[in-house]
Amino acid sequence: MVKKNSTKTKVQPYEIGELDHYLFGQGNHYEIYKKMGAHEVTKNGKRGVYFAVWAPHAVNVSVIGEFNDWDETKDKMKRGEPLGIYTCFVPEAKKGDLYKFCIETQAGEKIYKADPFANYAELRPGTASRITDISNLNWSDSKWMTAREKWDNKEEPVSIYEVHMGSWMRHPGREDEGFYTYREFAEAITKYIKEMGYTHVELMGIAEHPFDGSWGYQVTGYYAPTSRYGTPEDFAYMVNYLHKNNIGVILDWVPAHFPKDAHGLADFDGTPTFEYPDPRKGEHPDWGTKVFNYEKPEVSNFLLANALFWVEHYHVDGLRVDAVASMLYLDYGREDGQWIPNKFGGNENLEAIAFFKHLNSVVCGRNKGVMMIAEESTAWPKVTGSPEDDGLGFTLKWNMGWMHDFTEYMKLDPYFRKNAHHMMTFSMEYAYSENYILVLSHDEVVHLKCSMLNKMPGEGWDKFRNLKVAYAFMMGHPGKKLLFMGQEFAQLREWSEERELDWFLLAEEPHQQIQNWYKDLLHLYKKNKALYELDNDPKGFDWINKDDIFRSIFSFTRHSNDGKKNLLFVCNFTPVDRPDYRVGVPRRKQFKLVLNSDETKYGGSGEERPLVYKPEKQECDGQKYSFAYPLPGYGVAVFEY
């Protein structure tokens, strides 16, 4: 038998080969971003850039840019089968050059698209991609990354500061918008977070997006940190700097939908490429955006690899997945006749469910200690359950039910709170059904919802006193914590992405005092295992009195695994002083007052009171022992025992 000579060309490591096509076509090419997009390489001794783009229904594709005077006839790309991945090597292209793909559609049109896998983008309003090299970023956070692998998020303190970079703080008088760069922000936010006591920062709007008013939720560059604040190297510097100061970094991540901007993903090759073809699935009616087609392996792979990209390449510690409910339900935001049932006749998006299970299994399986956080607003079961047990596999879920009941209760005149007492206790009926984060996010301080301070009833100082007791109740309630920027010092105005926070308010005593209060709550939280170790275990929480309806007072205890340094919270939600409020306790041991809202540094009266309380053998609240405490109106007392 005569063997035929092989004519197969050897594939270089940077080139798209058969295995890449196979894995991408199966939806399992977890590092596809290392092949797709634009990468500086050396070919036959020449330095240049290798381009690769997926455009399955394109007739022809060429790459255009500053390196070829945007001439679509110069650098034609070769189609690779079976998936329709177009590639070419351009020796004239170099780091820093702008580029796009010119795609000839089956309709005979030419459309100009940014690179879906670009690692850097032109500053808006420009829409081109920019060649860069992120293969050798400077990292010195190995201590943090090693410790992260041993993290059990359920049993660790997680207090998140939700931040929109462009409006947290700005430089006055700059010719541009005054944005802090990634490097400037790293130093400023680190100093503030360490002083306040947060454990993590969650950043909105990091992935490239053209419209500031979308807050970063209409993404066109999924693999590119926005150029508003600097380069990819600058972004990596920021993450590294935060890690070296023991601060975790969480990013908002948007796999639910994408905008219709002409340079973006919509109708990428002249046909619905990344989105569902039928508008009853592919169009989001509320947001005017396109919905990703999770049924296509290449699309789910694009998103899954993107999650891994941020976590593995940029060392990000968690992703807050936006609008999960809109992905799970086919009829989300749609009227009858506007949606297509699944094959079983139901309203569940089976492909999105499979995507989440795959996503969370892979991200968390490859990266121990990383958090996948679901913003999910319905009662979908097992969001944080294991995929092996038919759960979605998220680490944590935003507790939207708690947030709604809590804010509605706090808006009420104290006289009427007794009629809504259950709104503050109901959350404990389901507190252990998921692994929850208690959130007071950006969504609660926009669109005429008012700032947290202005949600509070009353006038002047009463609003601040209400906010103090609200924050204390939140910090004591089981669940991780998240607060949006500005609310920690009682911002008056609603948030706007167009301006920085009203830091000038800190010149006024009431705003300093509420900031002091939240800071001390954060430090209390971080140093007491009782407040986080058993968040997901009923053994970590007990009501002392949840039925003091007519006085609107709540008392409860928090416990740690070892049973040491337990905490007792007593919270008064009316302005009525209770000079001898008797609280039942489970043990006859000393109770040490560790936090008292009536101190002058928090805006209280400064009235002296004992620091240690010895219970008497007097039944109260169903307990054998009790002690009396002078509880002021809107007062909070936290005791250690």
Where are the predicted features?
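Short, flexible loop/turn elements at secondary-structure junctions
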Residues: 55-57, 81, 92, 164-169, ...
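Short glycine-biased active-site loop of nucleotidyltransferases that positions the nucleotide triphosphate
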Residues: 78, 211-216, 260-267, 384, ...
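Short catalytic/ligand-binding loop motif for oxyanion handling, primarily in non-cytosolic enzymes
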Residues: 110-111, 169-171, 209-212, 257-260, ...
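Conserved alpha/beta catalytic core and glycan-binding cleft of carbohydrate-active enzymes
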Residues: 125, 315-317, 335-498, 505, ...
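Substrate-binding/active-site clefts of carbohydrate-active enzymes
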Residues: 145-155, 164-348
